[in-house]
Swiss-Prot record:
Site label Removed, positions: M38
Binding site for N-acetyl-alpha-D-galactosamine 3: D64, H101, G104, D120, R121, H122
UniProt-recorded name of the protein: Alpha-D-galactose-binding lectin
Tissue: Highest expression in the posterior part of the mantle. Highly expressed in gills and to a lesser extent in mid mantle and anterior muscle. Lowest expression in digestive gland and posterior adductor muscle. Scarcely detectable in hemocytes.
Complex formation: Homodimer.
Amino acid sequence: MTFAKQSCFNSIILLSIATSYFKIGHKISELGNRIEKMTTFLIKHKASGKFLHPKGGSSNPANDTNLVLHSDIHERMYFQFDVVDERWGYIKHAASGKIVHPLGGKADPPNETKLVLHQDRHDRALFAMDFFNDNIIHKAGKYVHPKGGSTNPPNETLTVMHGDKHGAMEFIFVSPKNKDKRVLVYV
């Protein structure tokens, strides 16, 4: 995507967010206090408050390392989003540069496919970060879920791909400086 297209896309996203906040009674000035663009962020399971981590917490996990939910916060669980095609992009583990993949790298992974980190970059690893509906969607249409679908999964719960939509599969993107402050990841 060219710089001009990316800038236009970012402006459209911000305008959409501003319009949504205005429609529900928030002042536009409050928007700046609530949403910040951030290149590095945490992925927080909305219901439980736990965060997406590479299993074991390594700064350079091996290919096919599972992604789990855990309550700890540290720099080895920071993520970045690299836009590739409009809303689609790679969810990158900031410390290692590896990206989130469905295990096996299938174009249409079945329900319960584990999420892992891997170095390869291809269209089967593209996701969109849906700020409005609080979910992470794979290009094939399935969503990131905690395995088992619990609203309060224990530490070390695997994350998987699944087609269902419900409150237990909602994720938000927050600042590493303030785990309660939402951030915009499309920068």
